[in-house]
Amino acid sequence: MSSNNPHVFAMVAGEISGDILGAGLIKALKTRYPDAKFVGIGGPRMEALGFESIFSYEELAVMGIVEVLSRLPRLLKVRATLIDELVKINPDCFIGIDAPDFNIGLELKLKNRGIKTVHYVSPSVWAWRPKRIFKIAKATDMVLSLLPFEKAFYDKHQVPCTFVGHTLADDIELESDKAQARELLGLDKEAEYLAILPGSRGGELKMLAEPFVKAASLIKQRYPDIKFVTPLVNQKRRDQFEQALREHAPDLEIDLVEGQSREVMAAADCILLASGTATLEAMLVKRPMVVAYRVSPITYRIAKGMMLTKRYSLPNLLADDDVVEELIQADCTPEKIATAVATQLDNDFSPMYDRFMQMHKSLRCDASARAADAVIKLVEDKV
């Protein structure tokens, strides 16, 4: 590309967490390349910065092996169309943000056509399906990892990798203000609150809304004065959750909030949530938590056979220890969830808080700027 033309960066972000990372990277790249253009698949945060989406990022918001298979024809069509469009555009660099099952194949196709490729957010190759490292090596010029222990795995396999830290750790203050969050959300200043986060995908709510609301009913019996608050990413997810409430806990009162999941977590005394990036946010706002998750039985059996780790949540993976309780698959029952939440409400949080603070500091690296620096070095052939 001529030096007189603006730089063009192609990106694909698969869901909310990717949209957050993508927006941070766009801002950082714009400090170096103010006229740069950004195109691909992105979410509302990226689009607010001028990103041009060829497809809606909700196309990629699927979970589980079985669930992905049902959408496979559409996903393959989206990827094929995207490849054609990006080859025509010929960007300076393609950055696949998470969504590895979609992005790594896309990166391989683009790299074979002479486009530089970066994968932002290491797939959990150190936890399951480790042989993916060989495809990643072929598909990418650089991996940007969020977690400090990941780089050693890539170094071992001689795959270029830069640890950049996590934008959430940069964005979230070391001390979160519960009173301020409650005032913002209009919540009771004095009440004890359990935040309930059943996930952002339709498939997650399908699996988790029922056990979560049933658990909340049991918790209410033990703690009559406790209150509940749930953030939901959009109206579709709200409709799903309200349906679960009507069916399984019609007398239970839960404050429903549109978005603002971070504020909801900061406002809470304890958090019940699905495994995923939200567990990192819960750790960063430093609230006691219980992590629960389940998928279809077939998906679980297949995935379990490929797992190299017994831990699922990011706090436990970062600590390499069982810091927070995880209730996975058969353990994801209302009774076990309620018991685990009660334990958190009744016990001293100080030891867990100290671990959370230590991990927060380890991830605070000005991640977006470090990621942008790595991309710029690649684009300018300095790596």
Swiss-Prot record:
- Annotated GO CC locations: membrane
| Superkingdom of source | Bacteria
Give EC number(s), comma-separated: 2.4.1.182
| Keywords (A to Z) from UniProt | Glycosyltransferase, Lipid A biosynthesis, Lipid biosynthesis, Lipid metabolism, Transferase
Please give the Pfam families that the UniProt record associates with this protein: LpxB
Q: Where are the transmembrane segments?
A: none
Listed under catalytic activity are:
a lipid X + a UDP-2-N,3-O-bis[(3R)-3-hydroxyacyl]-alpha-D-glucosamine = a lipid A disaccharide + UDP + H(+)
**Could you tell me one molecular function GO term of this UniProt entry?**
phospholipid binding
**GO BP terms:** lipid A biosynthetic process
Tell me which Gene3D superfamilies the record gives. Glycogen Phosphorylase B
Report the pathway entry. Bacterial outer membrane biogenesis; LPS lipid A biosynthesis
Q: Does the record bear Glycosyltransferase in its keywords?
A: yes
Family stated for the protein in its record: Belongs to the LpxB family.
Per the entry, what this protein does is: Condensation of UDP-2,3-diacylglucosamine and 2,3-diacylglucosamine-1-phosphate to form lipid A disaccharide, a precursor of lipid A, a phosphorylated glycolipid that anchors the lipopolysaccharide to the outer membrane of the cell.
Can you say what this protein is called?
Lipid-A-disaccharide synthase
Query: Upper taxonomic classification of the species?
Result: Bacteria, Pseudomonadati, Pseudomonadota, Gammaproteobacteria, Alteromonadales
Gene that specifies this protein: lpxB
